[in-house]
């Protein structure tokens, strides 16, 4: 009998729409591969829904809270339902960008200069030399991210909104000019490196998910030694945070820095996008792994105590 796979998608984070698109793509591919699939638009009754469904595997395609921060992983552990991607601890660490920075730096993965600040601090005055980047400490898909440039006399006024939806803790980091690079890890296998050219000022939400929002250059147009270093650092980051299944690490590379400090890891994504414009499926395809083979591998890799 075919395995029953519950594809967890949607949820209530700011990345809900992207998750629904990822979930639809994955569910369709899993059905084509012969699995019995139930699409679950995750609500706060998810534990009750999954208890009733009794799936063999939960395929987690949620982005943001609660699917990327360890919450859904903890529920699945309690219900004893094997699941895809990373476990409770790795998910929580990667979602907390400030904590992830500490872990990555300790493992030898270079991170940008910066640190955690409150929204109130960030809204009052520049908290570091411009240009710098402000981003929610527990956000994703570049939602709520600002580049504070040299010609800006004051921090972004959006930070003073009473209905600010992205939490009270922000990560402030120096802005690294240059190339946007990304690399994925699949189990213990590191994939290739993509160079991203955005039509926007930076690789924001629209660039990531709107057709034509960015151009993906694969393989990236960088020197072989930099290419291999990105791959090595991606695998190191995956292991340092204790990731499982598939992860994607994002980097900036400034070729003008000749002292070796030009390659910086921005973050590790434990729930990378799986839409038609997403990077991980593209990297897998470049390695000869079809989308159907990728999602099948993720189902068969699912387990508990990840």
Curated annotation (Swiss-Prot):
Its cofactor is Mg(2+); Mn(2+). Belongs to the D-alanine--D-alanine ligase family. The keyword ATP-binding applies. One of its GO terms (biological process) is regulation of cell shape. It is an enzyme of class 6 (ligase). Cell wall formation. Pathway: Cell wall biogenesis; peptidoglycan biosynthesis. It catalyses: 2 D-alanine + ATP = D-alanyl-D-alanine + ADP + phosphate + H(+). SUPFAM superfamilies: Glutathione synthetase ATP-binding domain-like (SSF56059), PreATP-grasp domain (SSF52440). Mg(2+) 1 binds at residues 250, 267. Its EC number is 6.3.2.4. It is found in: Cytoplasm. One of its GO terms (cellular component) is cytoplasm. Residues 101-300 form the ATP-grasp domain. ATP binds at residues 128-182. It holds the Pfam family Dala_Dala_lig_N. Keywords: ATP-binding, Cell shape, Cell wall biogenesis/degradation, Cytoplasm, Ligase, Magnesium, Manganese, Metal-binding, Nucleotide-binding, Peptidoglycan synthesis. NCBIfam families: D_ala_D_alaTIGR, PRK01372.1. HAMAP family: Dala_Dala_lig. Binds 2 magnesium or manganese ions per subunit. Signal peptide: none annotated. Mg(2+) 2 binds at residues 267, 269. InterPro entries: ATP-grasp, ATP_grasp_subdomain_1, D-Ala_lig_Van_CS, D_ala_D_ala, Dala_Dala_lig_C, Dala_Dala_lig_N, PreATP-grasp_dom_sf. One of its GO terms (molecular function) is ATP binding. This is D-alanine--D-alanine ligase.
């Amino acid at each position: 009998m075919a395995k029953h796979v519950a594809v967890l998608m949607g949820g209530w984070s700011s990345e809900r729409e992207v998750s629904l698109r990822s979930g639809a793509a994955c569910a369709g591919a899993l059905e084509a591969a012969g699995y019995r699939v139930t699409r679950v638009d995750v609500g706060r009754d998810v534990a009750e829904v999954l208890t009733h469904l009794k799936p063999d595997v939960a395929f987690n395609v949620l982005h943001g809270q609660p699917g990327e921060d360890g919450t859904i992983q903890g529920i699945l552990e309690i219900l004893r339902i094997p699941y895809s991607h990373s476990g409770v601890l790795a998910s929580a660490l990667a979602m907390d960008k400030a904590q992830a920075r500490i872990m990555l730096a300790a493992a030898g993965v270079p991170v940008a200069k910066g640190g955690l600040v409150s929204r109130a601090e960030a809204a009052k005055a520049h908290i570091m030399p411009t240009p710098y980047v402000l981003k929610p400490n527990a956000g994703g898909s570049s939602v709520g991210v600002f580049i504070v440039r040299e010609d800006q006399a004051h921090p972004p006024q959006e930070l003073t909104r009473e209905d600010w939806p992205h939490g009270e803790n922000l990560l402030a980091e120096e802005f690294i000019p240059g190339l946007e690079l990304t690399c994925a890890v699949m189990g213990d296998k590191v994939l290739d490196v993509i160079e991203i050219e955005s039509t926007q000022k930076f690789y924001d939400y629209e660039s990531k998910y709107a057709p034509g929002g960015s151009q993906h250059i694969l393989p990236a147009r960088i020197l072989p030694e930099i290419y291999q270093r990105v791959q090595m650092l991606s695998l190191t980051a995956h292991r340092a945070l204790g990731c499982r299944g598939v992860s994607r690490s994002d980097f900036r590379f400034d070729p003008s820095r000749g002292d070796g400090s030009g390659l910086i890891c921005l973050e590790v994504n434990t729930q990378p996008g799986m839409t038609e414009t997403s990077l991980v499926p593209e990297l897998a395809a470049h390695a000869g792994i079809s989308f159907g083979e990728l999602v099948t591998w993720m189902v068969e890799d699912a387990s508990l105590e990840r």
